[in-house]
């Protein structure tokens, strides 16, 4: 997958929103690639800029609450999405039900949607490998509760000096800093290395502030 990855470099524009600017740059690359299927994750507001594409399947994935996102918060927004997208996928029935709040004929319209649960390979857990290690994996922002984790983990590590903690993730838009001799903070880490690290972790912390659908972090840590 990585060898086929193409990054979209953005230059700041005073005349376009970041979303419109991003999609415009994407469409330039897409014109050369000519994909059959275009997947959009958690950005329903991008759909309005793709309506002129022809002979392509458009699939929208919701990982979070649709009612909290620009482009799907209102009933009108969501009906437009249903009329302009080939398929809408949710990672939980909770987020699917949230999408259809206030929409009539939802049983008929649900045929255009599908719930695709998070998944991972089943592994045998070797508890002998477990260490006194606490992990936090994900975006290092307040929405994911990293500020709660950071303030709390310092107290825990002070009280239990034989325990250590490791943090994996980054967040360029919000800077939260925590320091402790037993706290190791890593940036972006390849997925296979994250899974290897989880083999040693005894406690994995997930402290999001909202009714987050069952995420992959919880699943893989278990």
Question: Over which residues does each language-model region extend?
Answer:
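Conserved donor-binding/catalytic core segment of Leloir-type glycosyltransferases
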Residues: 89, 126-144, 150-154
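Nucleotide-activated donor-binding/catalytic signature segment of Leloir-type glycosyltransferases, i.e.
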Residues: 174-195
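Short beta-strand->alpha-helix junction loop in the catalytic core
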Residues: 65-66, 94-95, 112-125, 172
């Amino acid at each position: 997958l990585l060898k086929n990855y193409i990054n979209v470099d953005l230059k700041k524009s005073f005349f376009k929103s970041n979303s419109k600017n991003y999609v415009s740059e994407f469409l330039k690359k897409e014109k050369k690639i000519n994909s059959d299927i275009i997947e959009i994750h958690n950005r329903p507001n991008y759909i309005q800029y793709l309506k002129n594409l022809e002979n392509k399947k458009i699939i929208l994935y919701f990982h979070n609450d649709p009612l909290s996102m620009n482009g799907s918060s209102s009933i009108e927004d969501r009906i437009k999405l249903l009329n302009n997208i080939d398929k809408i996928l949710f990672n939980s029935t909770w987020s699917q039900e949230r999408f259809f709040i206030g929409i009539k004929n939802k049983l008929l319209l649900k045929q255009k949607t599908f719930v695709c649960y998070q998944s991972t390979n089943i592994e045998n857990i070797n508890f002998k490998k477990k260490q006194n290690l606490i992990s936090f994996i994900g975006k290092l922002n307040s929405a994911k509760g990293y500020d709660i984790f950071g303030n709390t983990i310092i107290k825990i590590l002070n009280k239990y000096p034989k325990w250590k903690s490791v943090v994996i993730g980054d967040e360029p838009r919000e800077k939260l800093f925590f320091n402790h001799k037993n706290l190791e903070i890593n940036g972006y880490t390849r997925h296979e290395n994250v899974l290897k690290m989880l083999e040693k972790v005894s406690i994995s912390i997930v402290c999001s502030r909202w009714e987050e659908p069952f995420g992959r972090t919880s699943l893989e840590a278990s």
